């Protein structure tokens, strides 16, 4: 398979894994968020604008997809947790969402 096709395939799977993670994560941290707010947060999670803060969005999704195909769903979720969650929380707070995430400082300086 040519590298571009492999990248697209990995990204396609990674996009699905990210969507599953985002929905699960939003339900776990749900603090009375309205369904409208939850939908807006989900859209932010999977947006190219957010993903581009890490690099080219397709490459970010492909990295998630590779974690999934090589080591399974738990590994892919861990990859997202370790690499994307803190910045997502910061981005959401900058947009006016008051996310209280267990185990994370309210105004974390990490990016």
Locations of regions flagged by a protein language model:
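RNase III-family endoribonuclease catalytic core
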Residues: 1-111
């Amino acid at each position: 398979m040519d590298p571009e096709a492999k990248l697209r395939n990995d990204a396609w799977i990674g996009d699905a894994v990210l969507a599953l993670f985002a929905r699960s994560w939003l339900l776990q941290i749900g603090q009375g968020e309205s369904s409208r707010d939850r939908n807006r947060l989900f859209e932010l999670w999977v947006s190219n604008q957010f993903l581009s803060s890490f690099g080219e969005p397709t490459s970010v999704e492909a990295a998630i997809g590779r974690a999934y195909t090589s080591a399974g769903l738990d590994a892919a979720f861990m990859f997202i947790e370790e690499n994307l969650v803190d910045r997502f929380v910061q981005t959401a707070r900058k947009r006016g969402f008051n996310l209280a995430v267990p185990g994370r400082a309210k105004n974390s300086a990490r990016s």
